[in-house]
Design a protein with these regions (language model features):
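Conserved active-site-adjacent core of cysteine acyl-enzyme catalytic domains
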Residues: 28-36, 96-230
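Active-site nucleophile-adjacent alpha helix/oxyanion-hole segment immediately C-terminal to the catalytic cysteine
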Residues: 2-114
């Protein structure tokens, strides 16, 4: 059975035939235009992710998207990490209150991404894309690519697109059941899979692409179905 996002993907394909979208130039990211010294919060090392003694997990059950956005913003711009390490009006004190500032930052981002959407329902992918555009421009622009995971061809297309994007930047993914439920962040390719930050656990896990095709993501990401990828625009 198709997911909500799968039905959305089918509707979008019909509308695109009626009203073809004009191609847009792909925005370059900092890694393609300059030599930025990266200070990512989340590394691509498998296992639990910590910074200044704090586990980098989501602060509550509705902030998986916010944790992913903070991780992506920190990858793109070291100022994000500096903000988290520095108390208001003070100098950088790595480890002194970092965890509470990290949690507060997630809640701030959650509010900024949900201007017209109930916060209890998490973050919409369009809200996430808008937040990256407005608050993390160094990450480059993203767009929402819905997935019909009942179509092998559609899944193959999105796997190829995510793999290509991972050569230059991380890619947020939205997974769920019949409805979308959870954000994770694909960090880089690893053989026949991807290394993915899963914010409920605060871990980077290896996702075999075979389970994406077979709709069996739950043992790794908590939910079986791939709903969307936020791809470079």
């Amino acid at each position: 059975m198709r997911t909500v996002s799968g039905f959305g993907r089918q509707v979008g394909k019909v509308l695109s035939r009626v009203r073809p979208r004009r191609s847009r130039p792909v925005a370059l990211v900092a890694s393609e235009t300059s030599t930025v010294e990266r200070r990512p919060l989340v590394s691509d090392r498998l296992g639990e992710q910590r910074h200044a003694g704090a586990v980098l997990d989501q602060v509550d059950g509705t902030t998986c998207g916010s944790a992913v956005l903070v991780a992506l913003a920190a990858w793109a711009d070291p100022a994000e990490v500096n903000r988290l390490e520095t108390p208001a009006g003070g100098k950088s004190l790595v480890g002194a209150g970092f965890g509470s500032r990290y949690d507060a930052r997630q809640k701030q981002v959650h509010g900024e991404t949900n201007r017209f959407w109930p916060q209890a329902l998490g973050t919409t992918p369009w809200g996430a894309v808008r937040w990256l555009r407005d608050h993390a421009p160094a990450a480059g622009r993203y767009r929402v690519r819905l997935v019909d995971d009942t179509s092998a061809a559609d899944v193959a297309q999105v796997i190829d697109a995510v793999g290509a994007a991972l050569a230059s930047r991380p890619v947020p993914l939205l997974v769920g059941s019949f409805v979308p439920r959870h954000y994770v962040l694909a960090l880089r390719a690893d053989g026949a899979g991807w290394r993915v930050y899963e914010p409920t656990s605060g871990q980077v896990r290896l996702l075999d692409l075979a389970v994406v095709r077979e709709r069996r993501l739950a043992p790794v990401l908590g939910f079986d179905r791939l709903h969307a990828a936020l791809l470079p625009s």
